[in-house]
Regions:
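Long C-terminal interaction/binding lobes of large macromolecular proteins
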Residues: 1-274
Length: 274
């Protein structure tokens, strides 16, 4: 009789252990729709975000926090990509294929839903170098949508074309994505002074020059075009690139210097006190 009782107890324990944990916690991780600064403009036809104004993400969990503390992912600059990939509801999307401004909107939304809109971090005074705590309000985001001037043509492939004012050279440009950010991240790690970042960015977003897509042609244009025309191209890209910024008025406690500061969107954005 005792053996039968032991068998029944063992069987009951095995059944309890085999229960799906998700069934015990009868809820689904909530999701939210994030407004895209690009409004879906700048993505080629066939891209999941082409002409889409929002993107659905789920709320962060403790498992997602583990990604942001992974030393190997942080060292390789892959932590934010992995986090965004995890949060995207549409798994056909990849973080590396999302325009930079839209990625930043996702990062702000994820951080806000996880920890609230108040972002307290240490900032360094640009004038004297003093470090002090400062609060930013994540609910007050400044969104810059793509600005199409009269001299900018939107192409069928999602790219843009602009003609330089003096040489009348037609430059085709595309918007930078997470894939391009990874290239810039590696370059900045190698070159701590940040030299050649502007020219590297131009090499990444310029698709063709007068219809020529060869790398050597694009590099020749960047290295030899008059500075005024290079600046014209960079300003045109700046107008086209959708961005989302979090800024706040800063006053130094040490030297009383006043300046508007902007929040950088990196892994420290989630762990400011780490």
């Amino acid at each position: 009789m005792r053996r039968n009782n032991e068998n029944r107890t063992k069987s009951r324990r095995q059944q309890e252990q085999s229960v799906d944990p998700a069934a015990l916690l009868d809820f689904v991780t909530p999701t939210e729709f994030v407004e895209l600064p690009s409004k879906g403009i700048g993505y080629p036809s066939g891209h999941p975000l082409h002409n889409q104004e929002t993107i659905e993400i789920r709320f962060m969990t403790a498992k997602d926090e583990d990604i942001l503390t992974s030393r190997s992912l942080l060292k390789k600059g892959l932590a934010l990509d992995r986090l965004i990939d995890n949060l995207l509801v549409d798994k056909t999307l990849k973080a590396k294929d999302i325009i930079v401004g839209d990625r930043n909107a996702i990062i702000i939304a994820a951080r806000s839903s996880a920890y609230g809109y108040v972002y307290e971090t240490k900032v360094e005074c640009p004038n004297c170098g003093n470090k002090q705590k400062h609060e930013f309000d994540l609910s007050k985001a400044d969104i810059h949508e793509p600005l199409l001037g009269e001299d900018i043509k939107e192409l069928d492939n999602g790219n843009y074309a602009v003609s330089t004012p003096y040489s009348k050279i037609e430059v085709e440009m595309r918007l930078l994505t997470g894939r391009d950010e990874a290239v810039i991240f590696k370059l900045m790690n190698k070159n701590k002074e940040g030299d050649a970042i502007l020219s590297t960015q131009m090499k990444l977003y310029i698709v063709s020059v007068n219809g020529h897509k060869q790398d050597n042609v694009i590099e020749h244009f960047i290295n030899n075009v008059p500075a005024a025309e290079a600046r014209y191209v960079r300003n045109a890209y700046k107008d086209l690139a959708p961005t989302i910024e979090i800024k706040g008025d800063f006053e130094c406690e040490s030297c009383n210097h006043e300046q508007e500061l902007e929040v950088p969107f990196n892994t420290d954005f989630f762990w400011p006190d780490r």
